[in-house]
Regions:
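The feature marks the mature, well-folded catalytic cores of soluble enzymes
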Residues: 1-84, 107, 123-373
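Intrinsic disorder/low-complexity segments
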Residues: 82-127
């Protein structure tokens, strides 16, 4: 949650209002865990906007933080392959995993159980049916301070917030926003990010791929070499340009303006998408999201994108930018990709001033991470 010591300070009131909107949307459908420097103040802010039923779904834990991009420092979860599964791996990564059976099967009925008393007691009885992978986060290649953010996983785990086995992978830098997993053995990523300076050098791309396969239980890593948005200081996270959806569908960012400096790179990305296949050799159904009209902050272009949506139980929360035609097209395409799900647009113009959006701010956890009662 943003506070006075984060980069959000110059527009703290505006971003807090946006965070409250996101919290309300999530808590309406599923449990919500918030890490906050000032939990009492956050609780008071939420109580002004959330219903009593929504507040019942909210748990707030005191944690100091450098920034607010939970996607990149939070645990990446592995769940065991279903009994009788034909997937020849130990488990499946669920950083984002729509499946043929439905959207985010790992998240349906997701519950984080909390009761009054010493939370540490729960850690002793946690349901150990999942693995919580704790990779090193170094502020996107040592661009920004990350010491406090790097402690949040351990702090919450020690307090019994999450069940399962914590696996320490501090020897490898990996951000949640840099990968997309279908839960069936395919992981999407970008070479511009994973091979960027100050992450895992001097490892080669082949060596990085082997680590990803072993630790994420993946059968195939699909690398994209194009599509970094102007203003994206993560070096090109996949969750800003290409997203996995049900039925082997990909929502991706396209550009029609040949005068846009991003046009050639996004066109090259589109060509790669057309020939990409999953771990079973199946091609993807492609749905092309519009590019928002350019947004600027102090003359610098911001990485506005509709691809940075968040999938929750029964809904998809989509960033919008007060651009009537583009917003409507994007929401309609997300609805086409996620039939049966509520589509919720949230104005993300304040969020993108810090070069991210809704998916970047959040991390989902599967039902298998719930604590034993």
């Amino acid at each position: 949650w943003p506070h006075e010591n984060t980069d959000w300070f110059p527009y703290l009131d505006d971003i807090t209002e946006t965070f409250v909107q996101i919290a309300k949307a999530v808590a309406h459908y599923e449990p919500l865990v918030i890490a906050a420097k000032h939990p009492d103040a956050v609780c008071a802010e939420l109580e002004e906007s959330l219903s009593a039923e929504e507040m019942e779904n909210v748990r707030i834990y005191e944690c100091d933080n450098n920034d607010t991009w939970a996607r990149d420092h939070a645990f990446i979860t592995l769940i065991p392959a279903a009994e009788g599964s034909d997937i020849p791996i130990e488990g499946t990564a669920v950083s984002a995993a729509p499946t043929e059976q439905g959207v985010c099967d790992y998240g349906k009925n997701a519950v984080v159980s909390f009761e009054d008393g010493d939370a540490s007691d729960y850690g002793k009885n946690a349901v150990a049916s999942c693995r919580l992978l704790d990779f090193r986060f170094n502020g996107w290649g040592e661009k920004f301070a990350a010491d406090k953010d790097n402690l949040i996983n351990r702090t919450l785990y020690a307090r019994g917030v999450f069940g399962g086995e914590r696996v320490d992978y501090d020897d490898f830098v990996l951000e949640g926003g840099s990968i997309e997993s279908d839960g069936r053995g395919t992981v999407l990523t970008t070479s511009v990010c994973l091979m960027a300076p100050n992450r895992n050098q001097p490892m080669t791309q082949a060596e990085v791929e082997q680590v990803l396969k072993e630790r994420l239980c993946a059968r195939k890593i699909v690398w994209f070499d194009h599509g970094q948005l102007i203003g994206d200081d993560t070096d090109g996270h996949i969750d800003t340009i290409v997203r996995l959806c049900p039925d082997n569908t990909l929502l991706y960012v396209g550009c029609d303006d040949e005068n846009d400096p991003q046009y050639a790179d996004l066109h090259a990305l589109e060509q790669q998408l057309k020939v990409a296949t999953d771990a079973d050799g199946n091609p993807y159904r492609l749905l092309r999201l519009p590019m928002p009209d350019a947004l600027y902050d102090d003359g610098d272009r911001l990485p506005a994108t509709y691809a940075n949506f968040l999938i929750i139980n029964g809904a998809v929360i989509v960033p919008t930018y007060a651009q009537e035609e583009n917003d409507a097209r994007a929401l309609a395409l997300v609805a086409e990709a996620f039939p049966g799900y509520d589509i919720i647009g949230i104005d993300s113009r304040t969020i993108v001033r810090q070069h991210g959006s809704i998916h970047c701010l959040t991390m989902q956890y599967p039902a298998e991470c719930r604590l034993a009662k």
